[in-house]
C-alpha cells in the first residue's frame, strides 16, 4: 500500500488540484484532499503531477530473435523510466508471432521478465509480409492484442480485405504500417529537400497515402476497426479526415519525432536520423499538428525502434530504419508544445493515456477511484539533457542527443507496484 502525498492531479477541465492518492491491492483506492493511514508506505509527491501511466501501442521489443537490439526486460525498463505502464509489442521478431505456439511462448517470457504490462500483437500474415493469413481465432485465444504486419505494408488488397473481415468477426483491430512497396523506389529518406541535397533516394508521400486510401475503403466494406501507424504526410491526414467524416471506423497515431522534426532539421548523412516513415516536409509536419488538434489523429505513439550501434552509426544508405522513444517522449513533447503554450497539459496527457485506451477499448489510462493503479509521477520543473548513456533501452539511437528538456517522469507505479523511482528501476 502506498499513499502519494501532496501531489497535483488534473481535473476534468484541465485544472490542477492538490490531492493525496491511496494505492491498495493494485487499485486506486481513494483520491482525497488529505489521506492519513497508519500502515503502508508514504510517497512524497509534493509539487509533482500525478497522472495515469502512459500507454504506447507501438513498441518494438525485438525479443525473440533480436536480443542484441532490445529485450522484453530492457524495453520494459525503458518504458517504466519513460512513464509507460502499458506497451504493445510489434511482431517483427524471429520467430514472428504468427501461431498460437509462438504467441504463447512470448506471453510466457513477458510474464517472466516484463516490468510493465506488455500486450503483444500477432502478425496478419505468416512470417510477416507474405500473402498467407494467420489463424486469427487461435491467436486471439492465445492473447493477441490486435493484428499487424508492422514494418511492411500488406501489399495485396485482397489479402488485406480478407484479414479485415476476419478481424471484424472477432471484434479486433487491424493495425497497419502503410507503405506501397512499388512506390518506395529504394528510398532511405523523404523525397524532398534533404534527399536532393545529399543525393539520396527519396520515399514520396504517396507511398503511404495511397495505401491508406485503399485501406479505409476496405475497412468500410469489411466493417473493421482500421488503425494507421505513424501517420506522416498531409495527404494521409486528409484521407483519414475524410474517412472519419464518412463514418468509417478508422483511427490514427503520430510519433513524437514527426511532430517535432521535419527534413530540414536533419544535419547530414547520419543513420541516427533515418526512420520509417522518414521525416517529411514542413508542410507535412504542420498537417500532422493540425490533425492531432482537430481529432483526425487520435493519439501519440513512439514507434520505439531500438538498434545496435553498428546498425545506426553508418551512412543512411546502410543504416537500419528507426529511433528509440520510450524514455524521451514526454519530456520532448512537454518541452516543445506545452511549455510553448501550443498545447495544454491535459491535451498531452490525454493523447498519451485515455485516448489510446479508448481507441483500443483498454481498461487503463484513467486516474480515478477503482481504476488500476498504473500511475506516473511527473516533475514538471526537472530539467535534464537527453543522454543515451543513461537509457535503460539497449538502443541508443536517437536524433535528440544533448537536447535539454524540462518535465520528466520521476516515479512509475505499475498495477500498484513501484517499478521506477528517481532514476532507479525497482
Swiss-Prot record:
Instruction: Provide the binding site for Zn(2+) 1.
Output: 58, 60, 150, 303
The protein's job, in short, is: Catalyzes the reversible cyclization of carbamoyl aspartate to dihydroorotate.
Classification via InterPro entries? Amidohydro-rel, DHOase, DHOase/Allantoinase_Hydrolase, Dihydroorotase_CS, Metal-dep_hydrolase_composite, Metal_Hydrolase
**Coding gene?**
pyrC
**Domain of life where this protein originates:** Bacteria
Q: What's any GO biological process attached to this entry?
A: purine nucleobase catabolic process
Under catalytic activity, the entry for this protein gives:
(S)-dihydroorotate + H2O = N-carbamoyl-L-aspartate + H(+)
In this chain, Zn(2+) 2 is annotated as bound at: 150, 177, 230
PROSITE patterns tied to this protein: DIHYDROOROTASE_1 (PS00482), DIHYDROOROTASE_2 (PS00483)
Which molecular-function annotations from GO does this UniProt entry contain? allantoinase activity; dihydroorotase activity; zinc ion binding
Entry keyword annotation includes Hydrolase: yes
Catalytic center residues: 303
Which family does the record assign? Belongs to the metallo-dependent hydrolases superfamily. DHOase family. Class I DHOase subfamily.
Q: Can you supply one Gene Ontology CC term for this chain's record? A: cytoplasm
Q: What is its EC number?
A: 3.5.2.3
Q: What class of enzyme is it?
A: hydrolase
The pathway this protein participates in, as annotated, is: Pyrimidine metabolism; UMP biosynthesis via de novo pathway; (S)-dihydroorotate from bicarbonate: step 3/3
Q: Which cofactor does it need?
A: Zn(2+)
Annotated residues for binding of substrate:
60-62, 92, 276, 307, 321-322
The name of this protein is Dihydroorotase
